[in-house]
Amino acid sequence: MSSEVDPILAPPNMAVFCDYENVAIGVRDAKYDAFDISLVLEQLLNKGKIVVKKAYADWDRYRPAKRPMHEAAFELIEIPHVSYSGKNSADIRMVVDALDLCYTKSHLEIFVIMSGDSDFSPLVSKLCENNKQVIGVG
């Protein structure tokens, strides 16, 4: 008997992309105490296996968040405030990274976009064209 998991029974692989600055602003504006990434990840694990986690922000401005995000095994992508050409720098980087993984990592079936922005409609359309499921959080 083989010890390999039947691919039909295996949970789908998932990639999570977090626009942390946008999420933090949403939490602040909603007057929540804090943002707890572990609660979000707990819910996402009901949908599949998380194999990629990337979070985008000017991490010097969000130092207290670095530790919990590291502990949750996120790759922290630095988007320096001085290089902002507008509020879309993190958005553009997220889109590029998501499409890169869409086209190069066929084992990824679910893409999670964590952001309060509605700017991601073209990305969602492109992911769906490539037979990917998309979950929006924010």
Residue ranges and their predicted role:
Residues 138:
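Basic phosphate/pyrophosphate-binding loop/patch that engages nucleotide-derived ligands
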Residues 1-103, 123-135:
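Domain-level signal for Mg2+-assisted phosphodiester chemistry and nucleotide/NA-binding surfaces
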Residues 104-109:
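Glycine-rich phosphate-binding loop signature in dinucleotide/nucleotide-binding domains
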Residues 120:
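Short glycine-rich, flexible loops that bind phosphorylated cofactors or substrates
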Residues 113:
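Non-catalytic, usually N-terminal nucleic-acid engagement modules in DNA/RNA processing proteins
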